[in-house]
A protein has these predicted regions:
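Phosphate-binding P-loop
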Residues: 30-36
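Hydrophobic anchor at the beta1->P-loop junction of P-loop NTPases
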Residues: 41
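Short, well-ordered alpha-helices that flank and scaffold nucleotide-derived cofactor binding pockets
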Residues: 31, 58, 62, 96
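Conserved nucleotide-binding/hydrolysis micro-motifs of P-loop NTPases
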Residues: 36, 47, 81-84
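Mid-core helix/loop region of P-loop NTP-binding domains shared across ATPases and GTPases
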Residues: 100-145
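Conserved NTP-binding/hydrolysis module of P-loop NTPases
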Residues: 74, 79-109
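P-loop NTPase Walker A phosphate-binding motif
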Residues: 44-77
Length: 146
């Protein structure tokens, strides 16, 4: 028996007004993130995974669940258009999203030896080292990879 998808939106829901019925999922995921756990959202296409990630990025939701910027910074990145790109280009794009996300919440100063956020390619060791430098020890960078 095939179930009907309850979501009528054709794109991920960005407006919290239209996001409802997922309080239990948001609560569970936020608790796992706050405790430093990794989380995987798995489900059929267009079931609301991207909308759920978008909801977690809302400042009011983060405040409600204790995901405060001085402890962790949530960074959303959609990989939808990146499947045919070399890994170095993907790492550079994620790095740019991280720098933008940290700049938006305005927590702490950036270390001076980080890669330029406009770099076009980034190898994995440099990407990994940069993530550690920008996040540790003041904050954890939480990547919400869609």
């Amino acid at each position: 028996m095939k179930r009907e998808n309850p979501f009528y939106h054709r794109v991920p829901i960005q407006d919290s007004t239209y996001f409802f019925g997922r309080a239990q999922e948001v609560d569970r995921i936020a608790a796992l993130i706050a405790n430093g756990q990794s989380v995987s959202l798995i489900g059929p296409r267009r079931i609301g995974k991207s909308s759920l990630l978008s909801q977690l990025c809302q400042p009011l939701v983060q405040a409600e669940y204790g995901l405060v910027a001085d402890a962790q910074t949530l960074v959303y990145f959609s990989g939808e258009a990146w499947q045919d790109q070399p890994t170095g280009v993907l790492y550079a794009a994620i790095w740019t999203a991280v720098v933008d996300g940290v700049a938006v919440v305005g927590t702490g100063a950036f270390p001076t030896d980080l890669p330029d956020p406009m770099v076009e390619t980034l190898d994995f060791p440099t990407f990994q080292r940069a993530l550690r430098q920008i996040g540790y020890p003041e904050r954890r960078i939480v990547l919400l990879l869609d």
